[in-house]
Amino acid sequence: MVRWLYSTNAKDIGTLYLIFAVFAAMIGTAFSVLIRMELAAPGVQYLNGDHQLYNVIITAHAFVMIFFMVMPAMVGGFGNYLVPVMIGAPDMAFPRLNNISFWLLPPSLILLLASAFVEQGAGTGWTVYPPLSGLQSHSGGSVDLAIFSLHLSGISSMLGAMNFITTVLNMRNPGMTLHKLPLFVWAIFVTAILLLLSLPVLAGKFVPALNLAVCWELFSSVFSKIIDVKDDQQVTYESYNFIWNLNDCAPELSISHMSSLLFFGSYLAGLIEGDGTIVVPKQERSAKGKRNYPSVQIVFQLKDFPLCQIVQKLIGHGTISKKKQAAAYILTINNIQGLIELSNLINGKIRGPKYYQFVLLVEYLNKKCPNLNLKPAGFNKTPLGFDSWLSGFIEADGSFQVRTSLSSKYPRLSLSFELVQSRITHYGFTMFTIMQEIAIFLETNVNEIRSERKNPQYRLRTSSLKTNKNIRDYLVKYPLKGTKYLDFKDWCKVLSYFEQGTHMDNTARIVEIKSQMNQRRTVYNWDHLQ
């Protein structure tokens, strides 16, 4: 229940839109049947000559079918499902706004249905304005409820339209220009623009402001007793914080699972050693007179943008930029306070050659802040199986492989995990010592590859059932946080077939799993970060 109420995932919201549209369609169909029964023959048929009731049915049928069936299903349902997939986006541009857009619709439908129980109902048709909505035609509050219903559904559609427009304009895959967009995305995009231009008629006038003012007055009077507000005390939004626990985080994801500083510090150190740089300038100013600043940069794959936001939020500092000529984002921390926070997080948790760059960074920070008194805590000597350093290192450079060779007479299936590191020397050290330590932990070997090229590398590969189980057991204890977690889950499914000895019987299923792994993945689910 909590998941469906608070979910910001586009597929979840799309599912809710479709369920809501089906429910509204049944109500609208009932109205449609009544209208057709009444019009099936000349004269009075089933409504006993009650023309106001007929007008109410006509009005309700129009509102329900358009605002609660067609638009939620066609735009909200199929749009949320297909638009992110078709443009290569992980989600909508504003996931929390997506949640609000949907949950404005149920109260809107309730208000419309409630209008039928006040007086004789709102029988104005589309002209919900005077004289039909005046006191002579409708002396009660039925039209007010219908108008408020239109305001809510209108603002819901406006928020959704803004979300779709922003998503299509800003979250397309690199290289997907507007003329390459699928026609369905164009249809949603143009529809959203038309909605944004037309719906202020229903949702953006002065009347909604009055309605909201009245609503807030009622809200205050109802909840004042609950929160024990005295007569002379002003009721503010802070008074209701006990009702809603608002998790104000930068990405549209929960970060409670990474809030442990011990876990996050080791994970972050592994992430930096795997695909990060620590830059400390030798001179305060360049030859051209420009000031040089130290910085720490962490590289994330394009599809790991939510993880990049989470790391930025947990550090509390940093800027995210697109890496030029590469499908990646860079998180850069270059302000003094941010570097101090980062240094405290990873101090004593670095295992490889980047430790010497970290020492230079600490010296620079102590020089800039004499009262800091930050001291390097040395290399991380904790056994690999007892902290999350390796998890961050794998997040940066690990890959889960499923290989299939089915064209020959004897088909072959293999499962492996790989870690590759450059042999570049840092301060007289290479990554071989670290790679060898990981290999011993996983009970495998390290090989040197591309030795004849300019960029020789060390490669660690697990290929036996035992070594694959070792890496699985570790990552269950210290889970990955990015999209590699999705590859790991699929990889574990294939590993279970190998454990049971049924991998040859499930060849088709393994090929299907392989088709969605690594760079071929088209569907991303961030539920593991909820």
From Swiss-Prot:
Membrane topology field: Multi-pass membrane protein
**What's the short name of a Pfam family annotated to this entry?**
LAGLIDADG_1
What is the E.C. number? 3.1.-.-
One annotated Gene Ontology cellular component of this protein:
respiratory chain complex IV
Q: Which domain of life is it from?
A: Eukaryota
Localisation per UniProt entry: Mitochondrion; Membrane
Q: What biological function has been recorded for the protein in this entry?
A: Mitochondrial DNA endonuclease involved in intron homing.
This one is known as Probable intron-encoded endonuclease aI4
